[in-house]
Amino acid sequence: MLFSLRRLKKLANLEAFSDQKVIDSLINLGFEVDQITKLNEISGIKFGQILEIRKNPEADNLWICKVQFADKIREIQTAAKNVIENKQVLAFIPGSKSGNTTFLAKKLRGHISEGMLISAVELGFNKHLLNSELDQGVLVFDPIFDLESNPLKVLELDDLILDIKLLWNRPDGNSYLVLANELAAFFKTDFSLINKEISGKFYSELKIINKTDSKIFALEIQKLPKLALVDIFLLLKSEVKIGNLAQNFSNFILIYTGQPSYCLQLEKHQQKVELIEQKVKIKYEPDTISSYHFLNQEKKPLLIPEFSDQIIMENNSFFLIMPKFNLLKVKQIKQFLKKNSLKLTQLGKNYNYGTTFIALSFLNFFLEDQKIDFSWPINFDKSLISKKTFLDLNYNELKEILGLELSQEDISKTNLILEKIGYNFDNTSFSPPFYRVDIEFFADYAADFLRFYGLEKLKDCKLEQVKAKIPNPDFEPVKLKTLGYYETNSFLLISKEENFNPLELKSQDLLTFPSQEHTKIRYSLAWQLAKITKYNQKRKITEISLYEKGSIAGWNHSLALASTIYTSEDLKKHLKILYNYDFDFLPADSEFLNPEKSQFIYLDNVLVGWLGQVAEKYNYENVNFLEILLSKVEKIPKKEGGKIKFRPYDNSQLKYRDITLSLPMKDIPDPYLKVIQKIPEIFSVKLINYVIINNQQKITYRITGPDQVCAEIDKFYK
């Protein structure tokens, strides 16, 4: 968001501090000042009042204006047709500068022009953001300014525009009041615009019937305020397009408080408004979208936010609607409209009721200053922000997190500063500011503590000398490529309906997401591998082996294999090649898996993965999968191997024994094979036959080894 440095300094009472010091403090407070732009390069301009206008007889489109300035009367020629007698203007007079240009008195078409009248564009504002009133010629306004005063100061035109990038979890920061409050706390100056009380002059009779899952608050205001010229300029500095009085007022509340709002006007006999969701269509677009509609008592639309505004009569009472719409719905509307306005952007952020309270508190101050009556808030109760979340205080943990030796005086002084931005402390706990949504853990408080304690107080630490160690190379990609697998990459997010969860992991619900197809953090890599496999099968590729390593729900890191070539037994061997652990395989009981062809993988009695085929309902019966949770496997220490012993070379021929296991259909051979594999010096165990007879599995394995292996097997079976 773009901020005016002049306005921030004015709100926070920082006029005594240099621009650079205030900018540095914003950076120290954790706000990324991405760009600093000077509004203009002008100096020496003056206020003037037009006394008389006459046409230049020697020119078709020039007017001679007699203008009263503080020091004298000057005649200035202009082609602007919107000049009016007794109105005030801004002017470059002889000696004024704009960039490298110095203005002088100059003869034009037979008459001396002692300067130039100024338009909004010449002050540095974007022409495309101006309304017709500001763009019809030079700036003309009512005679309210002292001609002795400096326009650059009074209208805040000697300004720097700061492009401040805010973290996604600080939607409250899109507000002049919140930033000014933090600056005032940092510099220990007074700031009183965020009060703890809200009031009203009367109680509104409006009833809002809300048939949506959104929250709607409102304020009845007796007259539409007209923004001062300096506040119109503030909107332009924020790259907000100037509109009618209602739009300007709503946008001013937005940049000042962070609360989006809309203006709504009812006929006097109407006491009820209904909020519903229904389809809306815009011109030249074939599609429709469900959006919010404010209806009157006759069920006719009064306002469709972001689609159609209501025309507000200036001198009649109206309602300022302050919504907290469903974030998903806002995102859909934003994509449908292909619109990226400041209001829509803020509507899509997770601001809380504290932001609405700040808006109501500021409106109390602003409307009283304008001598405009307003109601008590509609639907808003202070209890919405009085329910505080308390977190335990642990100053030893604070010192450990920050790596600082903090005295009790350091802690007390910093906590006093934090109280100015809304923290509350007692002996053992604290509650965060009522408008913040980012303070959930003690570490969040520690980060705020450091911001106001001072980043510059972090001491340089001498790095401990460590011995260089060459990391072990990662051979997994090479091994997988050698085994014939191709790497894939897929999205971390997946649709709710497709979220395949055989290991019963838990995931966070997302407040915002890119689309309906990407609403949940995936529980498994296998589902996307299955879809990639099916896509390639449709392309007549039948022999497919794929793998992916990536993140899944619960901060887990996973490896998944999918193959139409390899059997489940092959995948077990590949797992052993990749990770030399002694895994156990047990029958899998999961709605997501085929119970007859799937197994869970355990390591030291910890569930670390699954193997086999997905449930038949998914129609992927010819694809075998293996998925292993690497983050769990890595936590289990490897068992150290025994001491290596060398024996004399034995050149005798290897022999084999064929063993057939007869098992029930849901049983698996792994526990029986583990018993056999305990026989020392086995060379290999291979599956050579698998049949089903009378609902029994007949599984034949060939065990190869030297004479003593065959002797042990013969002994075992006897």
Swiss-Prot record:
GO cellular component, as recorded: cytoplasm
Ligand binding (Mg(2+)): 438, 444, 448
Cofactor: Mg(2+)
Disulphide bonds in the chain: none
Co-factor binding details: Binds 2 magnesium ions per tetramer.
Organism superkingdom: Bacteria
Sections of the chain in a coiled coil: none
Listed SUPFAM superfamilies: Class II aaRS and biotin synthetases (SSF55681), Nucleic acid-binding proteins (SSF50249), Putative DNA-binding domain (SSF46955)
Keyword Transit peptide attributed: no
Gene3D superfamilies per UniProt: 3.30.56.10, Bira Bifunctional Protein, Domain 2, Nucleic acid-binding proteins
Subcellular location as annotated: Cytoplasm
The tRNA-binding domain, residue ranges: 39-153
Domain B5 stretches: 386-460
The protein's Enzyme Commission number: 6.1.1.20
Key words, A-Z: Aminoacyl-tRNA synthetase, ATP-binding, Cytoplasm, Ligase, Magnesium, Metal-binding, Nucleotide-binding, Protein biosynthesis, RNA-binding, tRNA-binding
Reactions catalysed according to its record: tRNA(Phe) + L-phenylalanine + ATP = L-phenylalanyl-tRNA(Phe) + AMP + diphosphate + H(+)
Complexes and interactors: Tetramer of two alpha and two beta subunits.
Name of the protein in question: Phenylalanine--tRNA ligase beta subunit
Source species of the chain: Mesomycoplasma hyopneumoniae (strain J / ATCC 25934 / NCTC 10110) (Mycoplasma hyopneumoniae)
Lineage: Bacteria, Bacillati, Mycoplasmatota, Mycoplasmoidales, Metamycoplasmataceae
